[in-house]
């Protein structure tokens, strides 16, 4: 039977996901067979698994850090918010229904938790070490009885817990002491120690605080991780990246149910982007309608708030418009939806010659494709799809040539006048394509071409991990785990 180690935080945004990824890579580099696990995650940013299901982007990244192919076992329960306090429940990579927060809490959680723990124990039998990520805070008093992502998981497999605090936001000592006070005696016994994350400054100045914590809580500080500049995807934050301002004005519509906004990280680093929510803001060189968990409702939101008309007007005046996944569907001529919104036929924005019909089957695949859009014709791109709609167009954007490694020939997307749409999430992570596209827009403004800097998730994981390895007492963790 393998070992389990759990990382919990004093709050949401403490940095658990990336610390787990770093620990996964550290122990993998030490020669251990490691996998990540999170019993339940709530996120609109998902990724395809090896089984053809979907998992959260955080566990996808952590799997890469373990040098493993992402599996639905790493994130058995995924909740995808739909609005109006409802979420789609994805179990083992497949949607099993849509429920209200109250109904899920009272009826579904207990059953799914038991199944998730079975998956965790299976992983422990198959691997040397499972590194588990918690969710939010483990001591939200109003939710603690229903919490299936924190201490209940640790207790189920007797996993030592590292408690992480974000010192950059302030109040971290109080957060740690308060969390420890609100844990039960049994739960406190599971806590191995503390990590202070995102520190800027001289860590030696924290020594009196560490001595106080050890005396008060009886647990050691295992490390102080400095604030690390990186390009790793942030699961649920649109504002974590430093400001970048380039020559092009790139705008992304911040839809109420925006999903997979990690698609736009390369554009951020290459030029800078703005997320917009008001019609009067829309006037960019490039306007992007992103993916959505509720395509029709977000289309109607744009229509009701004048954003649709603003996009059409900006396009008429020369803006280039792109739609990704749900955004592509919205930019087409019509959508027939009896699945997500059940609104039947809805007129699209009409900038792309495409029609979409929603079906009950979700496609979740890795794709490779050849671009047909003239400025990048013949370029090879890859990405992934997570969608329930089927779209047809006489002018496809690309031809899919590989689905999960199997040969294919399937047109996808659509091309319009100064517009295109595609189902390929991650299209802009194809740096040669992005460079070609941005330089086309720059040339139209009389600007010199630029080189888009290439970077890889693998390089970013290694860079981030090196800093964590130097900052955390890994030897103490190994000793406590008995590895």
UniProtKB/Swiss-Prot annotation:
Pathway(s) of this molecule: Cofactor biosynthesis; adenosylcobalamin biosynthesis
**Residue intervals of the GATase cobBQ-type domain:** 247-433
Q: Does the keyword Chloroplast apply?
A: no
Return the CDD domains for the record.
Answer: CobQ_N (cd05389), GATase1_CobQ (cd01750)
Name which cysteines form disulfide bonds.
Answer: none
Q: Which SUPFAM superfamilies match?
A: Class I glutamine amidotransferase-like (SSF52317), P-loop containing nucleoside triphosphate hydrolases (SSF52540)
Location of the active site: 325 (nucleophile), 425
Q: Kindly list the biological process annotations in GO that this record carries.
A: cobalamin biosynthetic process
Q: Which PROSITE patterns match?
A: GATASE_COBBQ
InterPro entries found in the cross-reference section: Class_I_gatase-like, CobQ/CobB/MinD/ParA_Nub-bd_dom, CobQ_GATase1, CobQ_N, CobQ_synth, GATase_3, P-loop_NTPase
Per UniProt, the keywords (alphabetical) are: Cobalamin biosynthesis, Glutamine amidotransferase
GO molecular function terms noted in the UniProt entry: ABC-type vitamin B12 transporter activity; catalytic activity
Q: What stretches pass through the bilayer?
A: none
Q: Which NCBIfam families match?
A: cobQ, PRK00784.1
Q: Which family does the record assign?
A: Belongs to the CobB/CobQ family. CobQ subfamily.
UniProt function note: Catalyzes amidations at positions B, D, E, and G on adenosylcobyrinic A,C-diamide. NH(2) groups are provided by glutamine, and one molecule of ATP is hydrogenolyzed for each amidation.
Q: What protein name does the entry list? A: Probable cobyric acid synthase
């Amino acid at each position: 039977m393998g070992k389990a180690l759990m990382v919990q935080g004093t709050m949401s945004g403490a940095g658990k996901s990336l610390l787990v990824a770093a620990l996964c890579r550290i122990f993998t580099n030490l020669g251990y067979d490691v996998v990540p696990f999170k019993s339940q995650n709530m996120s609109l940013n998902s990724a395809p698994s090896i089984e053809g299901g979907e998992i959260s982007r955080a566990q996808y990244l952590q799997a890469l850090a373990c040098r493993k192919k992402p599996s639905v076992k790493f994130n058995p329960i995924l909740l995808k918010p739909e609005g109006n306090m409802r979420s789609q429940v994805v179990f083992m990579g497949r949607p099993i229904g849509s429920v209200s927060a109250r109904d899920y809490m009272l009826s579904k959680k207990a059953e799914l938790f038991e199944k998730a723990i079975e998956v965790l124990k299976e992983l422990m039998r198959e691997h040397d070490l499972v590194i588990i990520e918690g969710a939010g805070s483990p001591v939200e008093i109003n939710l603690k009885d229903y919490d299936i992502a924190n201490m209940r998981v640790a207790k189920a497999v007797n996993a030592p817990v590292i408690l992480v605090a974000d010192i950059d936001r302030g109040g971290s000592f109080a957060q740690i002491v308060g969390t420890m006070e609100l844990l039960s005696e049994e739960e406190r016994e599971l806590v191995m120690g503390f990590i202070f994350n995102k520190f800027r400054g001289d860590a030696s100045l924290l020594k009196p605080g560490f001595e106080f914590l050890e005396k008060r809580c009886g647990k050691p500080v295992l490390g102080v991780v400095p604030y690390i500049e990186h390009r790793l995807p942030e699961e649920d934050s649109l504002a974590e990246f430093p400001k970048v301002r380039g020559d092009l004005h790139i705008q992304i519509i911040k839809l109420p149910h925006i999903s997979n906004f990690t698609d736009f990280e390369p554009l951020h680093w290459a030029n800078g982007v703005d997320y917009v929510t008001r019609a009067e803001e829309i006037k960019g060189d490039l306007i992007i309608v992103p993916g959505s968990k509720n395509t029709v409702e977000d289309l109607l939101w744009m229509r009701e708030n004048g954003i649709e008309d603003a996009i059409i007007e900006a396009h008429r005046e020369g803006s280039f418009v792109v739609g990704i996944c749900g955004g592509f569907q919205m930019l087409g001529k019509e959508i027939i939806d009896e699945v997500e919104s059940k609104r039947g036929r809805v007129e699209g924005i009409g900038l792309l010659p495409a029609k979409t019909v929603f079906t009950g089957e979700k496609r979740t695949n890795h794709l490779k494709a050849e671009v047909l859009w003239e400025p990048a014709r013949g370029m090879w791109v890859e990405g992934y799809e997570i969608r329930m709609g089927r779209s047809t167009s006489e002018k496809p954007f690309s031809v899919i040539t590989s689905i999960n490694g199997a040969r294919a020939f399937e047109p996808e997307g659509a091309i319009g006048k100064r517009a295109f749409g595609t189902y390929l999430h991650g299209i802009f992570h194809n740096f040669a394509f992005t460079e070609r596209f941005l330089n086309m827009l720059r040339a139209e403004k009389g600007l010199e071409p630029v080189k888009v800097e290439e970077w890889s998730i693998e390089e970013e994981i290694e860079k981030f991990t090196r800093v964590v390895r130097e900052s955390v007492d890994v030897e103490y963790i190994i000793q406590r785990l008995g590895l």
